[in-house]
């Protein structure tokens, strides 16, 4: 697999950090949006590396892509509409579901790290 260690590290940090930011009801800040944009690029780099790797990694690729796309909806809402928009669309009742996705992501990213 292509060397994407830095993308893995950055994406992992960003997903975990952004979840905590939203869970703790912190206001939107410009740096958050920049991190969000860069994280999506890192996601695509990792996705491409998995696509170019062996066929045996395709189930991992599918799980990774589905999981991150589910997380992306939460981050996108916050990036586009701030905390107020996030709370209006998802509210506190969605935080446990979001957290479960982040925990699943953390496990998947460890599997990808093991390929490096």
Mark where each language-model region is.
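Short, flexible coil/linker elements and helix-boundary hinge sites characteristic
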Residues: 20, 37, 51, 57-59, ...
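Short terminal alpha-helical segments
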Residues: 1-43
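Amphipathic alpha-helical binding modules
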Residues: 69-116
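Short, solvent-exposed, charged loop/turn and helix-capping segments
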Residues: 42-66
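Extended amphipathic alpha-helical scaffold segments
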Residues: 12-19, 40-47, 71-83, 109
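Generic detector of well-ordered alpha-helical segments enriched in charged/polar residues
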Residues: 5, 9-12, 16, 62-65, ...
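Charged, low-complexity interaction regions
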Residues: 20-33, 51-58, 80-95
């Amino acid at each position: 697999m292509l060397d994407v260690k830095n993308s893995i590290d950055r994406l992992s940090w960003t997903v975990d950090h952004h979840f905590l930011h939203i869970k703790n009801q912190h206001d939107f800040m410009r740096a958050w949006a920049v991190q969000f944009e860069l994280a999506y690029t890192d996601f695509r780099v990792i996705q491409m590396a998995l696509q170019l790797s062996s066929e045996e990694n395709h189930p991992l690729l599918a799980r990774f892509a589905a999981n991150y796309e589910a997380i992306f909806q939460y981050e996108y809402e916050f990036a586009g509409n701030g905390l107020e928009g996030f709370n209006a669309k998802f509210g506190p009742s969605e935080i446990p579901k979001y957290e479960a996705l982040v925990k699943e992501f953390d496990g998947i990213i460890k599997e990808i790290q093991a390929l490096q």
